[in-house]
Amino acid sequence: FTIDLNNIWAKNKHFDSSKHTILLNSHLDTVKPNKGYTKDPFYPHSENGKLYGLGSNDAGGALVTLLGTFLHFHNEKDLPFNLVFAASAEEEISGKNGMEFLFSRLPKIDFAIVGEPTLLDIAIAEKGLMVLDCKSIGKSAHAARNEGVNAIYEAINDINWFSSYVFPKQS
C-alpha cells in the first residue's frame, strides 16, 4: 500500500496495465463531533446490533466493506480486471489533498465504486461541490453621478444567472 498525505491506496498484487481498472473508493475523514453526542464519538460502541461512533455511518461501513472486497481479490492471479483501493481524505471539506490529489498518482481508472450511504439504493451520480473564484469588473465614478459601473451589481447578475442555471441531465 501507499500513503500519500492522508490518503491510503493500493493496487491488486497481479496488476496488469493492459486490463481495465476498477477503483474501490470511500473516504476516511469525518466531520467534527457535535455537542449533542450522548456517547463518546471516538470509541466504537455496539448497542442492540447498531454501531455508534464517529464514521460508523458515513462512511466507515462502506470503507471497510470495500477494503474487505479488495483484500478478497488482492492475490488472485487471473482476474479479468485490476482493482485499486483508495481510502481518501478531505471529502468532508472538498479539499485538494483527497481524490483530486490522488488521481494524478493512481493508474488509469475505467470504472469506480464509491462507498457512500445511499439507503441501500444504487446511485449512479451524486451532487458535488463547485467552488468558483470570480472577478467582477466595474468602473469607478463619483457616487453622486451615475457614470460608473457598480461591480457588485454586475456580480449579482452573474450570481443570479448561475443560481438558476440547470445543468443538462446526462448519464
Question: Residue ranges of each PLM-predicted region?
Answer:
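Histidine-centered active-site/metal-ligand motif
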Residues: 27, 126, 142-144
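Acidic-enriched catalytic cores of C-N bond-cleaving enzymes acting on peptides and small amides
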Residues: 144-171
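Acidic/histidine-rich catalytic neighborhood of metal-dependent amide-processing enzymes
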Residues: 59-131
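Active-site metal-coordination/substrate-binding segment of hydrolases
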Residues: 19-84
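A non-catalytic alpha/beta surface segment that caps or lines the substrate-entry region
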Residues: 1-20, 42-45
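Short, acidic Gly/Pro/Ser/Thr-rich loop/turn segments
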Residues: 17, 29-31, 120, 141-142
